[in-house]
Amino acid sequence: MDAEIEVFLVDNGSLAPGATLELRALAKGLSERLGREVEAVSLLHSHKVNPAELGGMEATIVKRRMRASFAAGRRRFMILPLFLGPSRAITEYLPVLLEELREECPEMEVVIADCLFGQSVDRPEARLVEMLMDHVRAADPEGAMHIARRGR
């Protein structure tokens, strides 16, 4: 991945401080795995949370964060949606927002990765299915074993 590309882990956003703190923890873990910075950014709402509730660090939203990047001369972005599937936030709001930002910065380049579910409802992401099965097994080992035997 090109070092010039800014990578944003993007959720819908929330007024609950915990949501932003959890997004930051995921972004930090991903940064460590990738060996490059991944920044926690929300589509909406989180910028309204009092920074004192966020360890003194203000939350940001895509529009503000990309504008700050434009001002710093950056033009290339990757958005990693932290969404199970392509909600309206991803299929409707984000494209409109990006077109608005493109008017401000025509040379902007944006890559949007798939949502967690994958590219098609007909072929869900197998790793997500396995992760959910792990949760079932952890919550009820005996019941999960019965389910796993029946389902295979």
What kind of region is each of these model predictions?
Residues 1-152:
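Extended amphipathic ligand-handling, pore-lining, and cofactor/metal-binding catalytic surfaces
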